[in-house]
């Protein structure tokens, strides 16, 4: 089974590739997708909290981030 740090490294590579693809300005829809994907990885214990925080910092902020609302629960 792939180790958490290997998964985090692969995700970092993919995020960097997307940032380069979009000329350093990732569109909001892509950022929302990445944030949701990272939240799922965290929830299923595929990456550690520290890795999640580091990876999320590489993705542009999203106002009223739906991934955070889903991850934490709405109620």
Indicate residue ranges for each PLM-predicted region.
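Acidic, Ser/Pro/Thr-rich low-complexity regulatory regions
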Residues: 1-75
């Amino acid at each position: 089974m792939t180790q958490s740090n290997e998964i985090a490294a692969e995700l970092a590579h993919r995020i960097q590739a997307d940032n380069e693809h979009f000329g350093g300005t990732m569109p909001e829809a892509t950022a929302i997708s990445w944030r949701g994907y990272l939240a799922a990885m965290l929830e299923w214990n595929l990456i550690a909290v520290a890795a999640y925080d580091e990876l999320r910092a590489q993705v542009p902020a999203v106002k009223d981030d739906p991934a955070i609302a889903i991850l934490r629960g709405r109620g």
